[in-house]
From Swiss-Prot:
This is Choline/ethanolamine transporter FLVCR2. Changing T430R: In PVHH; reduced choline transport without affecting localization to the plasma membrane. It is found in: Cell membrane; Mitochondrion membrane; Endoplasmic reticulum membrane. It is linked to Proliferative vasculopathy and hydranencephaly-hydrocephaly syndrome: A rare prenatally lethal disorder characterized by hydranencephaly, a distinctive glomerular vasculopathy in the central nervous system and retina, and diffuse ischemic lesions of the brain stem, basal ganglia, and spinal cord with calcifications. Hydranencephaly is a condition where the greater portions of the cerebral hemispheres and corpus striatum are replaced by cerebrospinal fluid and glial tissue. Residues 25-72 are annotated as: 8 X 6 AA tandem repeats of P-S-[VS]-S-[VIAG]-[HNP]. Changing P276S: In PVHH; uncertain significance; reduced choline transport. The gene is FLVCR2.
């Protein structure tokens, strides 16, 4: 056994009672747990460390049945599984593959316009279809996640991603643009099975001191795919006039992504499991105990929309992520506008934005695990995103590409670094509601604003230039920063973990006092 603070590495099959683990003051659980009369723990009942009471007996609200058929074998044991990093890395990789396919057309927008003989708006829709399909499919897929679990959703998403990649190989003629649209639509459906999973994987597989880092790693893959999507297509597909030669270069890109998608599907089948044997945190253990097999899915959504803090986060997250989607889709067009013939550098600027954002995401995830300052960190990152966007807006047309690289990278560090922050903040604000539902609603907001911003900014750029188009985004980022300031730091998951620890310590103290009293009486009697 390897002690990891509040968790233990699962190195053998011998369970370790929760009472044997160290208390972590940074760990958190839903505030209603301590005040609900049927949830509070009776301090007069002593629980021996070697036979910890089942959490369903300690924290079972009335009317909720413990899902013994779906939860881990013993909820009184808190352990993390060694498989957890393999699971999150495989997920991160196939998420990367899917996001690459999202941006591979937009990063060389002008080349695909020439090859297929279509308008820039038609190529933009190959990106926006990802956003459009997500909106109606999110709630059904979130329901499937609750009904069938992580493994089924992972297999479905990876399989659809692989299928879409191979369908695109049938579109290597200029008149076959509809085929590439079909392939992209299949990949966009796969994305619905991917985007809502990072926070769920982090909660189900990782300990309380690892969840933010794990969520950042899961989101990291999506951002890496976008980065590669900016870098690789301009290199593999040069801007040439001969369409036959262009088809050859496009086929190389499509074959590579098809092979990678197939390999990742095989890895998902081998590596991805539904859940670890034991819950990795006290909050997750209690979440199993609080879960009802008859819980209303629509009721959960209704409760989320009654949570004002979460509603504000949904709006602000959508504004930030939507601005990122619009910038990513239109970046090639904006750079070529001021720097003709610089398709490769346009891709490199996109790469710089995303790589900087990946660094920001990892740093923010580590910082959250240590500080738990969700509201403060989110607000600071949002304000810096606005500052970065303003600087980028007024330096894009200066005629110096190296300046654009610096300002775009600074903006990306905060803009894409914000994305995992939003997921984790949402889980804190909505615990013990499903992470899949909360993160899914965030993503719906992002897709809606992404479509609106992409179409609007594209029209503004075509009619008035890049600066007015970017100022348009700055206005909405200002609104998002202002609304973020009104979100209260109601960290329910943190409170729940803390209260569970306090109740446990109180139990042990009562047990200790109870065991000492008979001894004292016996000595007096003698």
């Amino acid at each position: 056994m390897v002690n990891e603070g509040p968790n233990q590495e699962e190195s053998d099959d011998t369970p370790v009672p929760e009472s044997a683990l160290q208390a972590d003051p940074s760990v958190s659980v839903h505030p209603s747990v301590s005040v609900h009369p049927s949830v509070s723990i009776n301090p007069s009942v002593s629980v021996h460390p070697s036979s910890s009471a089942h959490p369903s007996a300690l924290a079972q609200p009335s009317g909720l049945a413990h899902p013994s058929s779906s939860g881990p074998e013993d909820l009184s044991v808190i352990k993390v599984s060694r498989r957890r990093w393999a699971v999150v890395l495989v997920f991160s990789c196939y998420s990367m593959c899917n996001s690459f396919q999202w941006i591979q057309y937009g990063s060389i927008n002008n080349i695909f316009m020439h090859f297929y003989g279509v308008s820039a708006f038609a190529i933009d829709w190959l990106s926006m279809c990802y956003m459009l399909t997500y909106i109606p499919l999110l709630l059904p897929v979130a329901w499937l996640l609750e009904k069938f679990g992580l493994r089924t959703i992972a297999l479905t998403g990876s399989a659809l991603n692989c299928l879409g990649a191979w369908v695109k190989l049938g579109s290597l003629k200029p008149h076959l643009f509809p085929v590439t649209v079909v392939g992209q639509l299949i990949c966009s459906v796969a994305q619905v099975f991917i985007l809502g999973m990072p926070s769920r994987i982090a909660s189900v597989w990782f300990g309380a001191n690892e969840v933010s880092t794990a969520c950042s790693v899961a989101v990291f893959g999506n951002q890496l795919g976008i980065a590669i999507g900016f870098l690789v297509p301009p290199v593999l597909v040069p801007n040439i006039e001969d369409r036959d030669e262009l088809a050859y270069h496009i086929s190389i890109m499509f074959y590579i992504i098809g092979g990678v998608a197939t390999l990742l599907l095989i890895l998902v089948i081998i590596v991805f499991k539904e859940k670890p044997k034991y819950p990795p945190s006290r909050a997750q253990s209690l979440s199993y105990a609080l879960t009802s097999p008859d819980a209303s899915y629509l009721g959960s959504i209704a409760r989320l929309f009654k949570n004002l803090n979460f509603v504000l986060l949904v709006i602000t997250y959508g504004l930030n992520a939507g601005a990122f989607y619009a910038l990513s889709t239109l970046l090639n067009r904006m750079v070529i506008w001021h720097y003709p013939g610089e398709e490769v550098n346009a891709g490199r600027i996109g790469l710089t934005i995303v790589i900087a954002g990946m660094l920001g995401a990892v740093i923010s995830g580590i910082w959250l695990d240590r500080s738990k300052t969700y509201k403060e960190t989110t607000l600071v990152v949002y304000i810096m995103t606005l500052v970065g966007m303003v600087v980028y807006t007024f330096t894009l047309n200066l005629g110096h590409l190296w300046v654009v690289f610096i300002t775009a990278g600074t903006m990306g560090f905060f803009m894409t670094g914000y994305l995992p922050l939003g997921f984790e903040f949402a889980v804190e604000l909505t615990y013990p509601e499903s992470e899949g539902i909360s993160s899914g609603l965030l993503n719906i907001s992002a897709q809606v604003f992404g479509i609106i911003f992409t179409i609007s900014q594209g029209q503004i750029i075509d009619n008035y230039g890049t600066k007015p188009g970017n100022i348009f985004l700055c206005v909405f980022l200002t609104l998002g920063a202002a609304l973020t300031a009104f979100i209260k730091a109601d960290l329910r998951r943190q409170k729940a973990n803390k209260e569970t620890l306090e109740n446990k310590l109180q139990e042990e103290e009562e047990e200790s006092n109870t065991s000492k009293v008979p001894t004292a009486v016996s000595e007096d009697h003698l």
